[in-house]
Swiss-Prot record:
Residue(s) carrying Phosphoserine: S475, S500
Residue stretches making up the WW domain: 213-247
GO process annotations (BP): regulation of small GTPase mediated signal transduction; small GTPase-mediated signal transduction
Lineage: Eukaryota, Metazoa, Chordata, Craniata, Vertebrata
PANTHER family reported in the protein's UniProt record: RHO GTPASE-ACTIVATING PROTEIN 9 (PTHR23176:SF103), RHO/RAC/CDC GTPASE-ACTIVATING PROTEIN (PTHR23176)
Protein name per the record: Rho GTPase-activating protein 9
């Protein structure tokens, strides 16, 4: 591709290397320019200012002094690209030295492209002309070689095959083949990118009163009648720009560029091959119907006051996802990788976009600029909705208007809103996105097995079969179809791409990929395994109602084992339930009790050797001789319950009953509230309080009074569903309630 700048190699060939400026050379500013010097002073140049050229420091900056300034004033640096050099008319032309390629002093010409150079070449052949031709006002898009001088056409000799000539090679070829002294110009021309200088805007674009030429999405193209240039206006934002709007993703071939200029040469000048030339990149360059070669040149665009610099290749930008819905909801996470978590409700700004549900900690300002979230904030977490299951969470929370989201990795979230219409809108939006993702996955599975254009070897995560309900049972025909699809779209990238395509190693790796992807596609979700009884839920962190239903009792068996061990050898221990046990041993006991699995910190599953080991667990063995380990495991079991033993919905009523002045009325209301609790909660609470009454009977030895036991078990039994801002205020009345129940146990539990 030709370039519009002459590089130092071309300067050396043409004899135009860096040299001192001719005496009496003047500069005229083409455009206004302002910069800050090294000493911190600001230098401003206005259009039409004239300077006396002192020295051409480099190709970008020249040292000059203003004409009206005294000779003792300090010179300044001016941008060479913004200046035009002029000479004093009193200069006389110099003689031509035979055998050398020199020009006589004279006004310098600025050639912004190869076309302007070709237009200026005929003036060289006239020895008598001392004044150069005027600068062309407009560039031609295409110049035929009929208008070029014969001296320029001489270097191109006919031959069996032509070769591509760059803009740097063109003047060198012309000068190398010139025989004898040539009539020269009065001053060597200076080549710079005049096209880029002309494209630099001197003023902002005019208003939209100009005629509309074209509409592209929200951008309108108009023509400025004064300058003859096109400008663009965004009809939505009102933004005006001289530059055309950039697309976020370009599908054009990099070889075909905008703003190309063509130089046509006749068949007698260049003899191209029958099927076209081959460029440096290895792709054949097209020929026009007359057989002439087309040389393309991409014009670069400068933003003033930046100077010419190489621009990187355009990158493909991902299209921004459209925001489906956003709003303020109450959110809590109840499961992480299949492990139950304690509820922690809190407000969150939720954004539904693409295939993700993004959560922000803080709500946006009153008028957010976009639906993505608060400006300058980072998302707290996100949920991948591919294969997710959406349902109402009435059975998971006592709150109203709750949505339950379960994902493939085993993460579960609850979304709640005080307004039913708002939650219905979220339910419709989430269901629409999930169904669209399911249809997309099914369409991809039924599509042809060919690799998509432009995707390369990149694996799309949506190629996996993400199903949130039921095991994926594939027939033999489906296996064969899936295997053919997996061969063309491998799941894992093992070693390199070349080894996976060619040779026996690549075949083996493809076979491994196919097996792995078939295994993942057939792997049933966790919910289906639990429904079929293959995987049973844990003991710690399990719903009390489901645990009792599975065990066929109203009191969990692990709670019975712990209370029996404490009744046997712990009632006389000083500080029972007040002293903490060894946490490592407590976790070991918990691991043995859990029926399903233990989840490590990095998300891996550790399965016990045999499920259901709590049935054969002996807490009287020497391994559990420390009674504080047993009591610590009992308290941990109560804390890990997803719902506290006393339902959070009854907490305000318990607190109101406690505030009554009459004791009989207070006990009557508390008894009614206890009777309204579910059967597993009621029986478990009674079994626990009955055991604590036996502990109080030995308070002379263990020093555990009703007040001390209320401090230990109050925050656990009467835990609120949402954390309060003042924990001290909440920790007061639960202990009083437990103390009241222990003191009046016989009247509350007849």
């Amino acid at each position: 591709m030709l370039s519009s700048r002459w590089w130092p190699s071309s300067w050396g060939i043409l004899g135009l290397g860096p040299r001192s400026p001719p005496r009496g050379s003047q500069l005229c500013a083409l455009y206004a320019f302002t910069y800050t010097g090294a000493d911190g002073q600001q230098v401003s140049l206005a259009e039409g200012d004239r300077f006396l050229l002192l020295r051409k420091t480099n190709s970008d900056w020249w040292l000059a002094r203003r004409l009206e300034a005294p000779s003792t004033s300090r010179p300044i640096f001016v941008p060479a690209a913004y200046m035009i050099e002029e000479s004093i008319p009193s200069q006389s032309p110099t003689t031509v030295i035979p055998g050398q390629l020199l020009w006589t002093p004279g006004p310098k010409l600025f050639h912004g492209s190869l076309e302007e150079l070709s237009q200026a070449l005929p003036s060289r052949a006239q020895a008598s002309s001392e004044q150069p031709p005027p600068l062309p006002r407009k560039m031609c898009r295409s110049v035929s070689t009929d208008n070029l001088s014969p001296s320029l056409l001489k270097p191109f000799q006919e031959g069996p095959s032509g070769r591509s000539l760059s803009q740097e090679d063109l003047p060198s070829e012309a000068s190398a083949s010139t025989a004898g002294p040539q009539p020269l110009m009065s001053e060597p021309p200076v080549y710079c990118n005049l096209v880029d200088l002309r494209r630099c805007p001197r003023s902002p674009p005019p208003g939209p009163a100009c005629p509309l030429l074209q509409r592209l999405d929200a951008w309108e193209q108009h023509l400025d009648p004064n300058s003859g240039r096109c400008f663009y206006i965004n009809s939505l934002t009102g933004c005006k720009s001289w530059k055309p709007p950039r697309r976020s993703r370009s599908e054009t071939n990099p070889g075909s560029m905008e703003g190309t200029q063509t130089l046509k040469r006749n068949n007698d000048v260049l003899q191209p091959q029958a099927k076209g030339f081959r460029s440096d990149t290895g792709t054949p360059e097209p020929l026009d119907p007359q057989g002439s070669l087309s040389l393309s040149q991409r014009t670069s665009q400068l933003d003033p006051p930046a100077l010419q610099a190489p621009r990187p290749l355009p990158q493909l930008l991902d299209d921004p996802h459209e925001v489906e819905k956003s709003g303020l909801l109450n959110m809590t996470k109840i499961a992480q990788g299949g492990r139950k978590l304690r509820k922690n409700w809190g407000p969150s700004w939720v954004v539904l976009t693409g295939n993700s549900l993004v959560f922000y900690r803080e709500p946006p300002p009153t008028a957010p600029s976009s639906g993505w979230g608060p400006a300058g904030s980072r998302p707290e977490s996100s949920v991948d909705l591919r294969g997710a299951a959406l349902a109402h969470g009435r059975h998971l929370s006592s709150r109203r208007n709750v949505l339950h989201i379960r994902t493939i990795p085993g993460h579960e979230f609850l979304l709640q809103s005080d307004h039913e219409t708002e939650l219905r809108a979220w339910h419709r939006a989430l269901r629409t996105v999930i169904e669209r993702l399911v249809r997309w996955v099914e369409a991809r599975r039924e599509a042809p097995t060919g690799r998509d254009q432009g995707s390369g070897d990149r694996e799309n995560p949506l190629e996996l079969r993400l199903s949130g309900s039921g095991p994926a049972e594939l027939s033999a025909g489906e296996d064969e179809e899936e295997e053919s699809e997996l061969v063309s779209k491998p799941l894992l990238r093992l070693s390199s791409r070349r080894s996976s395509i060619r040779g026996p190693e690549g075949t083996e790796q493809n076979r491994v990929r196919n097996k792995l992807k078939r295994l993942i596609a057939k792997r049933p979700p966790l919910q289906s395994l639990q429904e079929r009884g293959l995987l049973r839920d844990q003991v710690f962190g399990c719903q009390l109602e489901s645990l009792c239903q599975r065990e066929g009792d109203t009191v969990p068996s692990f709670l019975r084992l712990c209370i029996a061990a404490v009744d046997k050898r712990g009632l006389d221990v000083d500080g029972i339930y007040r002293v903490s046990g060894n946490l490592a041993v407590v976790q070991k006991l918990r691991f043995l009790v859990d029926r399903e699995r233990a989840v490590t910190s990095d998300g891996r599953y550790v399965f016990p050797e045999q499920p259901g080991q709590e049935g054969r667990l002996d807490l009287d063995s020497t391994e559990w001789d420390d009674i504080h380990v047993v009591t610590g495991a009992l308290k941990l079991f109560l804390r890990e319950l997803p719902q506290p033993l006393v339902p959070p919905l009854l907490l305000p009523h318990f607190r109101a009953a406690l505030a009554l002045s009459e004791s009989e009325q207070c006990l009557s209301q508390i008894q009614e509230l206890i009777g309204s609790m579910p059967k597993p909660n009621h029986d478990t609470l009674r079994y626990l309080l009955e055991h604590l009454c036996r502990v109080i009977a030995h308070s002379d030895k263990n020093r555990m009074t009703p007040h001390n036991l209320g401090i230990v078990f109050g925050p656990t039994l009467f835990r609120p569903e949402q954390e309060t801002s003042d924990p001290a205020a909440h920790a007061l009345y639960p202990g009083q309630l437990v103390q009241l129940m222990l003191t009046n146990f016989t009247s509350l539990f007849p």
